[in-house]
């Protein structure tokens, strides 16, 4: 579904930029867009051009001849870009390798739009984000890519299942409780298999190659190499990172604290580095999509509410790499499985929200008295409080904070969500939601 949406956006008025963490499929998606244009849209091959800036020779040639791309279009299509009567599609991968070329791309866009349709992608979000935002101001539309979603994995293994996004239905006002009850009845024979698959992905994470690894050793080797590549290629060369080893130690410490309140003073003291440096390094982790700070929701009631943000990581698999806890039973016995499940649910909510036209925000809610709701999804008109519980059952104590939140913001809250491992249910405006229905 992402590819047709991207093509629709590409045919709009903005330059499309694919962002996201390393190895989340940006190159693959570019190639799928090319294939979609050829097979589904029947776009002539001579109107589609793909260049990968990872090619050192290409970068050298572009530096010496900035108009090389226009010359290539003219050569292979048989006429210059200005003479085309139908759109020409230009896909450029790993564009962060040549940020000086952004000014040239801006010139192409301003000169040849709407004939030229331009899509860029790359791994180093810092260079792409800051440089593109400045160069292409008012001209770009960004799409963030994520690792696999749990729904994709469940669809892959249980191809006969229909697993709609209940969260999307709630956000778009088309929630149908009766239809979902029937779906749940169809799922009952597969509950144990679904639970087994969930246990696997909580440990492995959902980066494609980590999830598809044949065994724990292969998975850990991949994640270890991913971490090294991120630090060596994306971070080591950045002027903002004064001490590479301090950055690496902070990254490890933050991974072990997923789901916790961010305490920059404590991190500074534990690592022996200045608070300003901690703040700067955390900003880099956010801009490269590895780390996310979730801010508390305060609304109009600001007294007696916690103000510190909570930290989450983009994929749960790295917790095992850093902690050494590499299987589900060990994680359960360590007491760390709760924060990992919470982190996992946040990522799945993010993936579902990225497909929504509502552009919702996500927060958490906690009072100084200890009442807490794990997540609060905020749209223009509604709030949806979300509690997370790694269990196949629930009690009234699991609902009390949802109800307290609703009582605090009665005009904003209609539906509430409890994510857990039991069957899909709907009662008293609370949706009891298995992870595979997010």
Where on the chain are the PLM-derived regions?
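Walker A/P-loop
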Residues: 27
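Domain-level recognition of nuclease-like catalytic cores that cleave nucleotide substrates
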Residues: 421-438
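Pre-Walker A adenine-sensing motif
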Residues: 1-13
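Conserved catalytic/switch belt of AAA+ P-loop NTPases
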Residues: 102-119, 134
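Interdomain motor-coupling "hinge/lid" segment immediately C-terminal to the ATP-binding subdomain
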Residues: 131-247, 251, 255
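Short glycine-rich substrate-engagement loop in P-loop NTPases that contacts/grips substrate
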Residues: 51-85
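Accessory nucleic acid-recognition modules appended to NTPase machines
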Residues: 49, 211-383
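Hydrophobic anchor at the beta1->P-loop junction of P-loop NTPases
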Residues: 18
């Amino acid at each position: 579904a992402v590819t047709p949406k991207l093509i629709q956006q590409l045919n709009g008025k903005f330059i499309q930029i694919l962002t996201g963490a390393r190895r989340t499929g940006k190159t693959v998606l570019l190639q799928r867009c090319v294939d979609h244009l050829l097979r589904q849209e029947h776009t002539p091959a001579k109107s589609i051009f793909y260049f990968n800036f990872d090619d050192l020779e290409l970068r050298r040639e572009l530096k010496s001849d900035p108009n090389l791309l226009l010359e290539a279009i003219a050569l292979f299509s048989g006429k210059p870009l200005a003479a085309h009567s139908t759109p020409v599609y230009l896909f450029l991968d790993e564009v962060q390798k040549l940020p000086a070329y952004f000014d040239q791309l801006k010139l192409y866009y301003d000169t040849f739009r709407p004939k030229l349709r331009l899509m860029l992608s790359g791994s180093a979000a810092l260079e792409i984000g800051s440089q593109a935002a400045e160069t292409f101001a008012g001209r770009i539309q960004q799409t963030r890519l994520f690792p696999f979603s749990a729904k994709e994995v469940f669809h892959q293994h249980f191809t006969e299942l229909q697993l709609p996004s209940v969260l999307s239905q709630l956000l778009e006002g088309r929630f149908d409780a009766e239809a979902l009850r029937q779906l749940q009845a169809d799922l009952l024979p597969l509950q144990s298999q679904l639970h087994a698959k969930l246990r696997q992905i909580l440990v492995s994470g959902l980066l494609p190659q980590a999830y598809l690894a044949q065994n724990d050793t292969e998975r850990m080797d991949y994640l270890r190499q991913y971490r090294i590549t991120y630090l060596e290629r994306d971070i080591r060369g950045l002027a903002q990172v004064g001490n590479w080893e301090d950055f690496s130690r902070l990254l490890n410490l933050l991974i072990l604290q997923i789901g916790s309140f961010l305490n920059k003073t404590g991190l500074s003291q534990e690592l022996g580095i200045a608070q300003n440096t901690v703040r700067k390094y955390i900003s880099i982790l956010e801009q490269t999509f590895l780390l996310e700070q979730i801010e508390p929701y305060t609304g109009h009631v600001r007294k007696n509410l916690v103000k510190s943000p909570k930290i989450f990581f983009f994929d749960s698999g790295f917790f095992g790499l850093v902690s050494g806890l590499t299987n589900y039973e060990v994680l359960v016995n360590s007491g760390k499985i709760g924060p990992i499940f919470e982190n996992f649910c946040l990522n799945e909510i993010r993936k579902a929200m990225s497909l929504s036209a509502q552009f919702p925000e996500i927060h958490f809610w906690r009072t100084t008295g200890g009442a807490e709701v794990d997540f609060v999804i905020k749209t223009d008109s509604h709030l949806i409080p979300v509690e997370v519980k790694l269990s196949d059952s629930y009690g009234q104590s699991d609902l009390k904070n949802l109800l307290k939140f609703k009582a605090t913001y009665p005009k904003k809250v209609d539906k509430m969500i409890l994510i857990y491992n039991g069957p899909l249910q709907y009662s008293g405006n609370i949706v009891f939601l298995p992870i595979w229905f997010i």
